[in-house]
Amino acid sequence: FTAFNFKNRKGYYNKVWREPDAAAGLAWLQYISWIKYGDKKYLNATRQCMAFLQNRPQKEGTFYEIMMPYGAYLAVRMNAELGTAYDELKMLNWCFDGNNSDRDGWGVMCERWNKYDVHGLVGQKKDEQYAFAMNTFSQAAALVPIVKYNPAYASTIGKWMLNLAN
């Protein structure tokens, strides 16, 4: 879908593009609701959204623009807190590598543009090549906390943050 109408409880497709990472954003909202209210319906909704991401093939990355990092965060957090077995690396790679089926090229820069170092910025890695500060800040806000749930990512996330600060 392109969007979800919460009032009508139906997905919406604008016949131009799809944003499959909306499942990640919705999963995050539902998980936080479960933590706050304790109602299992929120956890069940989280699991449905995460199942969509988990069952999607690696080659069909879901990162459209801003929500997938929240799904990657949840994969790491739920694996730590609930003992789930979500494919953390697959979801994290979707946030970085730029190989996404619905917005190919969207990921994290690993290069210089002429004399400018753009390593770590989030945006379009292929074709036009452009990056956005707010997308970068949002991705950092979603992914830095994963080191709390899986310290094995601390070095990698730290290196990415160092590049952002450069």
Named regions from a protein language model:
Residues 1-10, 35-61, 86-121, 156-166:
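Long, well-ordered core segments of solenoidal/helical folds
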Residues 1-17, 67-85, 108-132:
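Carbohydrate-binding/catalytic loop surfaces
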Residues 14-17, 24-38, 69-83, 127, ...:
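Well-ordered alpha-helical scaffold segments within catalytic/enzyme domains
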Residues 15, 19, 61-62:
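Alpha-helix N-cap/helix-initiation motif
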Residues 22, 64-65:
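Extracytoplasmic catalytic/substrate-binding loops of multi-pass membrane glycan-assembly enzymes
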Residues 47, 132-134:
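Amphipathic, non-transmembrane alpha-helical scaffold segments
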